[in-house]
Amino acid sequence: MKGLMGRKVGMTQIFNEDGIVTPVTVIEVAENVVTQIKSDETDGYNSVQVGYGEKKIKNTIKPLQGHFEKAGTTPKRTMKEFRVDSTEGFTAGQELKADLFQAGDKVDVTGISKGKGFQGVIKRHGQSRGPMAHGSRYHRRPGSMGASAYPGRVFKGKNLPGHMGNVQVTAQNLEIVRVDLEKNLLLIKGAVPGPKKGVLVIQTTVKQGK
């Protein structure tokens, strides 16, 4: 499994040779550095720990300062571990760039979705509204919530109004349309979670379908 962290730049569109337009999300994947190598011999499994984003030394706790110094790099704001079949080709302090992926690769993109605040059931869960006529008292309310005297309660998981968004979301099996090696950019087909400048995790998809 290959993986990088990046920052969402925004969306645009590109045209192929036949003039077909494809909406893409632009993700900048600069500043990825290997901070630790884990192997079967030392940890019982193979993985590569990657750090992303610069962080001031004064804001980094002493144990992590030593961790980054051992890897020969500066403190990083975010760290993520990617499981790999083999750690060959990876070394501590190595900088990972966009060439880790190629056009046509399928990836999963994970990010924190946009926060929407407190929302009702129509926006939050896609429920239908009631009649909007003058005589109706039921427009955008949740409606019936349960049964009668038995069980006499609302079941857990019932779709109700509440806080919407600001949770971790993964968009699966997205295609990388283009890789810009000069600017360290990945152009991924479609939309991905999160706002502009949001930190994303891009890794090989778990759905190895056709």
Curated annotation (Swiss-Prot):
User: Which SUPFAM superfamilies does this entry report, sorted A to Z?
Assistant: Translation proteins
The answer on whether this UniProt entry bears the keyword Transcription reads no
Query: What's any one GO cellular component for it?
Result: cytosolic large ribosomal subunit
Q: Which UniProt keywords apply?
A: Ribonucleoprotein, Ribosomal protein, RNA-binding, rRNA-binding
Gene Ontology molecular function:
rRNA binding; structural constituent of ribosome
Task: Report residue spans for region: Disordered.
Answer: 123-144
- Tell me, how does this one assemble? Part of the 50S ribosomal subunit. Forms a cluster with proteins L14 and L19.
Q: NCBIfam families given for it?
A: L3_bact
Q: Which family does it belong to?
A: Belongs to the universal ribosomal protein uL3 family.
What does this protein do, in the record's words?
One of the primary rRNA binding proteins, it binds directly near the 3'-end of the 23S rRNA, where it nucleates assembly of the 50S subunit.
UniProt-recorded name of the protein: Large ribosomal subunit protein uL3
Q: Which organism is it from?
A: Alkaliphilus metalliredigens (strain QYMF)
